């Protein structure tokens, strides 16, 4: 008997000490997934210790159980001196760590002024429910949640083009599971991975789903532009989570060689930025970007120092030295920092990713043009009516938008995005013209529809198409979709299309298990079918890089209606046809999504902007003081690498804004005038618009000729000297050049060295395809050119005195004269600083 008792005690101890799934020594192989489903609280070993999960049954007979590991630490808590620092690997823990409850959310403020126009509709419509997920907040928040399937999925038919009725074939994947890491959105200010239960997606798609918390707002993205606080801590948190997965996911039955990152909104922007960062190289293989890119106006913060100053002043940390200011901010409580109301320019962000020369080494578009994302398969798309929140405030009634409200909204949109008064008049009228339905221009509902399309096209569609095209230009696999469905929920206007974030419940399989507090919809069988379709596409892509393979579309288990997606083959996006999949109840593969409007934003608007800047370079006026950082006397620690403020000359009396402007209406809007005057105004406006188009065409042709000339004259890049073309460095290191010689020297460097033609060096540089300035706020400081990185001194002092004007609005600025503490134009070490 005593021998039997000893044996039983030994078995129990073995189960507690690692005899369960993933048991054994840390770093050893985990056990099979089948054993995970046999225990109520399975234990898995990781490189840092053992964790105990919990087995959950799902409310659907076709879905197998899922083991959840909630609140697993992937980094050391960023407390004290670790605030405003990159994350570190977690410390090991003794015994078995309980991972059965959700972790705390990162500090955020849902009760302050929210950027509602940028947040998902389901979030803003259910703020009380969303608040329950972030009630438990802590700066110690760097945790992830893992959802591991316990079954390999049902038998299904294997796609066979040659067989009309293929037999049931076992294509279940019993090996290592693909891994899908979800990056939540929320304008980099709100949200948590706890809001998204990955159980249904894991069980239905036979993948391991992971969600995480990363630092948000000021704690995740504050930047001073120098070594004191480089920023991008939230992105570094995501990279650290990927490192943890690469090291540990095999213990949970996952495949570290098949990791896919996916996100929505700001999370999708993070996906794009991680694709472009060398820090994440080799940590994942595929990427899905839902309604977000790295080249939207809200994706990157181009003026972080401005908002850092504002925050520091609000909490009593306004110091001239940036190191002292950051140390002061470290001593403040997280709640005091998070609760400060620091409002960005409309359509922009106050705290978000910055171009630091390291994590984000250059402007995202420049990196994409250089082919920095060739190693990743990509799936990207948008929803039909992303800009719903932009329009709701302008919708005065159920009858739509009045003509005056339409004009005001467009004017406000242009005023907040473009910083030159003369150019805005041209852009404003051109945008109104393009987004007026001339067949039914007096219809308020049609005005509302076109206004919704305007915001959607500018903020989501055009950047997404540009990103997909840049990817496809390098023959890299990319799939594009448009989502045309949303669930029926109370409070949603009948005229609303699929808005920002409406695809998320279908991606996570919410219709299969019923409505939740965040998604209180009346889900129908069609919703269940569409969710199954989306999950199949997403998990197929995670498995093979092809959303069509290996699992075909088959939803006969839901209802007897045929699934139209069974006959659809999702084609790759290419630069010519630009194919995309229309995801809705009537799916179809089409090409050139909103091609006219996309070309308008990507081609015509940048040239109109260039036209203005070239015509008015000698008469640039100071933008409104409300959007400009006030000038100060230069301090001793101020860098000279920043764009100078415009000359402090007041505009002529006729240009001073004395009140609300009565913007010109479209011809025919002023019905109080006589017929003759109306005809005169109509003809005049038409001629004006034709002149604008003619000028735009002329300048476009001139720019194309100039671009071709630049390409012909540009020699192949060299690598020996660090100068484009491989020529020797210009002899300017020992002396300070006059401004004119500095400009010529810089243009000669870009043109190919000393041997280049000086006359050609004085020509404007070739502008980028998608003008960078159009994504910045009116008072944003532009980026330096690629390869022109310099370290900013440690100071939060006032801006420097203005250097001579640039030869081109998008060209580089002359480098500062060398000093005892200055650096060369190469990155001095792995951590460079923000270019502001």
UniProtKB/Swiss-Prot annotation:
Keyword Transmembrane: yes
Location(s), subcellular: Cell membrane; Postsynaptic cell membrane; Presynaptic cell membrane
Signal peptide: 1-14
Glycosylation: residue positions: 98, 136, 522
Disulfide bond positions: 106-141, 317-328, 487-521
Residue ranges with Pro residues bias: 796-819
Extracellular side: 15-678
Region of interest: Required for interaction with LHFPL4: 679-699
Protein name from the UniProt record: Neuroligin-2
One function term, GO molecular function aspect: identical protein binding
Cytoplasmic compartment segments: 700-836
InterPro entries with a match to the protein in the record: AB_hydrolase_fold, CarbesteraseB, Carboxylesterase_B_CS, Neuroligin/BSAL, Nlgn
Coiled coil: none
